[in-house]
Amino acid sequence: MSERTGLVTRKTRETEVNVTLNLDGTGVYWVHTGMPFFDHMLQTFSKHSLFDLELTAQGDLAVDGHHTVEDAGVCLGQAIKKALGDKNGINRFGHAIVPMDDALTMAAVDLSGRGLLVFDAAMPSPRVGDFDTELVEEFFRALAVNGEFNLHIRLLAGSNTHHIIESIFKAVACSLKEAAGMSGGTGIPSTKDTL
């Protein structure tokens, strides 16, 4: 099997983001975005997906974190798409229900070639430290649209915003790990013979 890796660089007037991803990794990460809480969530994503991830971002944080978080999602989504290649032999679908203390999140993925986010998770607090919690949805929308996969996220329980966000990142990581995993079969998992 050839390496399933993706390398993406994006430079705009607002941000510069570099991503290197290995789908068949061990969860090794090196992340620096200038936003410590977001770094922690991306590290959590890498650890629980077992995707090796190097992600660096420099953005206009003096304005706010929106551009940095969204562009990180754009680049990570594109890296996932590149690493999946023609999707021959993948599971295609993945889902997980993940607790984090009081929080419980369901995530489901279809690596269908169609980018869509359905996000049903209200945040009790507008901020966790310096991190704007409405950016969680923006990150996952950019990830799903640019990765060209369906992603459903539903919060089932939770009152602590940090725990809610962490359970979301872990649930998505576990879902993508399953969906991107190799089924042991051959061929494209679609009656269309393409994804």
From Swiss-Prot:
Its EC number is 4.2.1.19. Pathway: Amino-acid biosynthesis; L-histidine biosynthesis; L-histidine from 5-phospho-alpha-D-ribose 1-diphosphate: step 6/9. Keywords: Amino-acid biosynthesis, Cytoplasm, Histidine biosynthesis, Lyase. One of its GO terms (biological process) is L-histidine biosynthetic process. Pfam families: IGPD. One of its GO terms (cellular component) is cytoplasm. It catalyses: D-erythro-1-(imidazol-4-yl)glycerol 3-phosphate = 3-(imidazol-4-yl)-2-oxopropyl phosphate + H2O. InterPro entries: IGPD_sf, ImidazoleglycerolP_deHydtase, ImidazoleglycerP_deHydtase_CS, Ribosomal_Su5_D2-typ_SF. It is found in: Cytoplasm. One of its GO terms (molecular function) is imidazoleglycerol-phosphate dehydratase activity. SUPFAM superfamilies: Ribosomal protein S5 domain 2-like (SSF54211). HAMAP family: HisB. Belongs to the imidazoleglycerol-phosphate dehydratase family. NCBIfam families: PRK00951.2-1, PRK00951.2-4. This is Imidazoleglycerol-phosphate dehydratase. It comes from Pelotomaculum thermopropionicum (strain DSM 13744 / JCM 10971 / SI).
